[in-house]
Amino acid sequence: EGFKKLSKACHIDADKKITKKHLVEIGCNYIEFGLKNANTYDLMFGTAVGNFAEYPELLESANSTYENMRLSFSKLASDSDEVIAFKCITLWSMVHGLVGILRKVQVVGDDFDEGVGPISTASVIATNLEDHLDKVLTGLIQS
C-alpha cells in the first residue's frame, strides 16, 4: 500500500516531454510523502519486511518508483544507461536522506543555533526545497 501511494505521488508520464522541473516536483513529492507518512515510510524502508523477494508484488511496487525516476532522468541526461543508473541512485539517496534529516528539523523546530551544525543548514533547505533540488539535479545532469 505504501509503495503504491509513493509511486503514485512520484509518477511522471515518461512518454511525454520530461523537464528538470518535473524531477524537482517528484523529489518534493517523495520528501513530502516521507514527512507526512513517517510510520508507513519507516515500514517501507526499514527492516520489518526482510527479504522483498518473498513478496513479489511488494517488490514490483517498490521497484516501479525507482524505474520511473530512472527513465525520467534518462530523458534529461546524455549518459550511458550505467551512468544514468548511478546518477539516479545518487538522486534517490539524496531525497531519501533528506526525509530523515528534515524529520529532525521538524522535531527541533526553531530550537537550534543559526549557522551551527547540520540542522541549521537543513532548515534553510526545508524552506527552499525546490531550489535545493533544482541545484542538485543540475549538478547530476551536467556531471
Give, region by region, the residue ranges found by the protein language model.
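Generic structural signal for alpha-helix termini and adjacent loop/cap motifs
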Residues: 36-37, 47, 105, 143
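Short, flexible helix-adjacent loops and helix caps
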Residues: 11-15, 46-49, 103-107
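Charged/polar positions within long, soluble alpha-helices
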Residues: 11, 35, 39-42, 74, ...
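Hydrophobic alpha-helical connector segments
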Residues: 8-39, 64, 91
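Short, basic, alpha-helical segments at the C-terminal edge of helix-turn-helix-like DNA-binding modules
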Residues: 1-4
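Hydrophobic alpha-helical bundle segments that form small-molecule/ligand-binding pockets
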Residues: 12-16, 64-91, 140-143
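Short secondary-structure transition hinges
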Residues: 39-68, 113
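Hydrophobic/aromatic-rich alpha-helical bundle segments in the mid-to-C-terminal region
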Residues: 52, 56-59, 74-136
